[in-house]
């Protein structure tokens, strides 16, 4: 029984989903200018659950549709569906249950806009990216990255309903950070795993354009990212504490991206990939801490 539960747990890509729902949680905290009301706490908790269920469902559908590809790649050849621990119909039913629960929670007890945006993001990743973009273009990560960048807006929507223009603008800034972060994050992994992608006929940028070109693109997007991460300060959403942290995190990421250029180093690409995960977690954590510090300063003064 425990082994079977673990198989279903693995279908949800728990580590990936954890980062997704963390950014959604930060979006919730940043959306509330003061102390949250009882209604906001309830909406936030149920929204968090609904977003997590949808992300888990998207991960399961991705594994269902990518089973043949996963079987050809060392990184994914262990997945439950690939090795026969679960059957395709079981994965389909599992994902369907998760989607039903997610949409029921978000529609009935959170708000309609969160449900619509969450479902749109799910389709964007699980179907449009997985079935079409991933297999058709080397810009798959760039175009499809929007679906994966949406969680902060989903979290923001859960507690505000995105009822004002300011809500849309501020939530969009958080989405923009993840959107621009996505290409250097995945391309670093793709450099390290490019033989796997080539074997599976997936046109990732290092496969179609080479490592050197991909490294230059990683640097370009990291430079853009270092600018985009300053926008929350420019708009007044975040303050000096976040600014200092963002500058340090950006400087380190830029060093990784620059170091990746000459000479192209596969092992260093994997280190860059690892740092990119730490980077995003830390950046959003500092966004949240900065928000709390500013709230504390407001109430103390």
Curated annotation (Swiss-Prot):
Catalyzed reactions per annotation: heme b + (2E,6E)-farnesyl diphosphate + H2O = Fe(II)-heme o + diphosphate
EC number(s) per entry: 2.5.1.141
UniProt membrane topology term: Multi-pass membrane protein
Involved pathway(s): Porphyrin-containing compound metabolism; heme O biosynthesis; heme O from protoheme: step 1/1
Location of the protein in the cell: Cell inner membrane
Single GO BP term: heme O biosynthetic process
This protein's UniProt keywords: Cell inner membrane, Cell membrane, Heme biosynthesis, Membrane, Transferase, Transmembrane, Transmembrane helix
Primary enzyme class: transferase
GO MF annotations in UniProt: protoheme IX farnesyltransferase activity
Protein origin, superkingdom: Bacteria
Stretches that traverse the bilayer: 16-36, 41-61, 93-113, 114-134, 141-161, 172-192, 217-237, 238-258, 273-293
Signal peptide: none
Family stated for the protein in its record: Belongs to the UbiA prenyltransferase family. Protoheme IX farnesyltransferase subfamily.
Record's miscellaneous remark: Carbon 2 of the heme B porphyrin ring is defined according to the Fischer nomenclature.
Function (record text): Converts heme B (protoheme IX) to heme O by substitution of the vinyl group on carbon 2 of heme B porphyrin ring with a hydroxyethyl farnesyl side group.
Name of the molecule in the record: Protoheme IX farnesyltransferase
Protein's gene: cyoE
């Amino acid at each position: 029984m425990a082994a079977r539960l673990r198989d279903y747990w693995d279908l949800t890509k728990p580590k990936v989903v954890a980062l997704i729902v963390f950014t959604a949680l930060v979006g919730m905290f940043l959306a509330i200018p003061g102390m949250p009301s009882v209604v906001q706490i309830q909406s936030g908790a149920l929204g968090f659950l609904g977003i997590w269920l949808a992300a888990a469902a998207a991960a399961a559908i991705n594994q269902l549709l990518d089973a043949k590809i996963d079987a050809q790649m060392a990184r994914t050849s262990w997945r439950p569906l690939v090795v026969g621990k679960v059957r395709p119909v079981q994965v389909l039913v599992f994902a369907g249950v998760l989607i039903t629960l997610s949409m029921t929670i978000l529609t009935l007890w959170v708000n309609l806009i969160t449900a619509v945006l969450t479902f749109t993001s799910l389709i964007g990743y699980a179907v449009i990216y997985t079935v079409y973009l991933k297999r058709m273009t080397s810009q798959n990560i760039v175009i499809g990255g929007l679906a994966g960048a949406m969680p902060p807006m989903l979290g923001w929507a859960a507690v505000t309903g995105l009822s004002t223009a300011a809500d849309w603008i501020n939530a969009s800034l958080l989405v923009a950070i993840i959107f621009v972060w996505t290409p250097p994050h995945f391309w670093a992994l793709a450099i390290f795993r490019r033989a796997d992608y080539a074997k599976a006929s997936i046109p990732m940028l290092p496969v179609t354009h080479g490592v050197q070109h991909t490294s230059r693109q990683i640097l370009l997007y990291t430079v853009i990212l270092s600018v985009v991460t300053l926008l929350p300060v420019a708009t007044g959403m975040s303050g000096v504490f976040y600014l200092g942290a963002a500058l340090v995190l950006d400087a380190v990421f830029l060093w990784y991206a620059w170091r990746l250029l000459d000479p192209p180093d596969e092992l260093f690409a994997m280190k860059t990939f690892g740092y990119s995960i730490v980077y995003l977690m830390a950046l959003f954590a500092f966004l949240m801490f900065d928000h709390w510090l500013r709230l504390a300063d407001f109430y103390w003064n």
